């Protein structure tokens, strides 16, 4: 438990900082552009991470929203209940996960439709011999063909959105104080470590996507959708009263923020 607490302490000192929430979106956008330029101008040699079957891609990135959802669910519930003691407020804050699920579902559906309506089936990856009889990606692949359309990077979208959402929710740790004897201490500490490492995986795999996969425009649109999903919720809607709201803050901190705004 002592090692876990040390990890949690380090993660609190990094991911929970307001500077991280402020600059991470810009860092992701900049690294996506830099990685994409590197891919176009001086491609890196193939490696384990450039293989789509690598462990991180198969068991984490492919189900990134499931990991994010399953770890944020108990984290939001425990930290918000610890601070407020109000079940209604906890349920309201948990609805952020429903909103996130809706954003994930709608965006991936949009990407799939764009790839469908802009694509065609070919006999080879070199786009030779168009097979007009196959009108869908599933049918094309089923017949051994290769579908080529505008494939917006789902990884760039989802990894951006998940990383930013986790960092936003971990801001509550500024207010959460538990000692070793507290009944929630072990659970919250474990979740902090798990979410911290998950965030680093998302950022690392986002960088791998930038330097190994998709073209620049596909990654630009994917990252843009992720940033819009984050900013539209945490930057706009969640500031309103008719929303799931932001992570709870102490009255003293709110007073300081109100004074600063004035």
From Swiss-Prot:
Q: What is its EC number?
A: 3.6.1.-
Q: Where in the cell is it found?
A: Endoplasmic reticulum membrane
Q: Which GO terms describe its biological process?
A: cytoskeleton organization; fat cell differentiation; fatty-acyl-CoA catabolic process; intracellular triglyceride homeostasis; lipid droplet formation; lipid droplet organization; lipid homeostasis; lipid storage
The membrane-spanning stretches of this chain are 24-44, 58-78, 94-114, 146-166, 191-211, 219-239
Sequence ranges on the Lumenal membrane side? 45-57, 115-145, 212-218
Keywords of this protein's UniProt record, alphabetized? Endoplasmic reticulum, Hydrolase, Lipid metabolism, Membrane, Transmembrane, Transmembrane helix
| Domain of life the protein comes from | Eukaryota
The membrane topology term of the UniProt record is:
Multi-pass membrane protein
Q: A GO molecular-function term, please?
A: diacylglycerol binding
Topological domain (Cytoplasmic) residues are: 1-23, 79-93, 167-190, 240-262
What's the catalysed reaction?
Answer: an acyl-CoA + H2O = an acyl-4'-phosphopantetheine + adenosine 3',5'-bisphosphate + 2 H(+); (9Z)-octadecenoyl-CoA + H2O = S-(9Z-octadecenoyl)-4'-phosphopantetheine + adenosine 3',5'-bisphosphate + 2 H(+); (5Z,8Z,11Z,14Z)-eicosatetraenoyl-CoA + H2O = S-(5Z,8Z,11Z,14Z-eicosatetraenoyl)-4'-phosphopantetheine + adenosine 3',5'-bisphosphate + 2 H(+); hexadecanoyl-CoA + H2O = S-hexadecanoyl-4'-phosphopantetheine + adenosine 3',5'-bisphosphate + 2 H(+)
EC top class, in one word? hydrolase
**Gene Ontology annotations for the cellular component aspect, listed alphabetically:** endoplasmic reticulum membrane
InterPro entries on file: FIT, FITM1/2
Can you tell me which residues form the catalytic site? Answer: 155, 214
Q: What does this protein do?
A: Fatty acyl-coenzyme A (CoA) diphosphatase that hydrolyzes fatty acyl-CoA to yield acyl-4'-phosphopantetheine and adenosine 3',5'-bisphosphate. Preferentially hydrolyzes unsaturated long-chain acyl-CoA substrates such as oleoyl-CoA/(9Z)-octadecenoyl-CoA and arachidonoyl-CoA/(5Z,8Z,11Z,14Z)-eicosatetraenoyl-CoA in the endoplasmic reticulum (ER) lumen. This catalytic activity is required for maintaining ER structure and for lipid droplets (LDs) biogenesis, which are lipid storage organelles involved in maintaining lipid and energy homeostasis.
Q: Which family does it belong to?
A: Belongs to the FIT family. FIT2 subfamily.
Q: What is this protein called?
A: Acyl-coenzyme A diphosphatase FITM2
Q: Which organism is it from?
A: Bos taurus (Bovine)
Could you tell me the gene encoding this protein?
FITM2
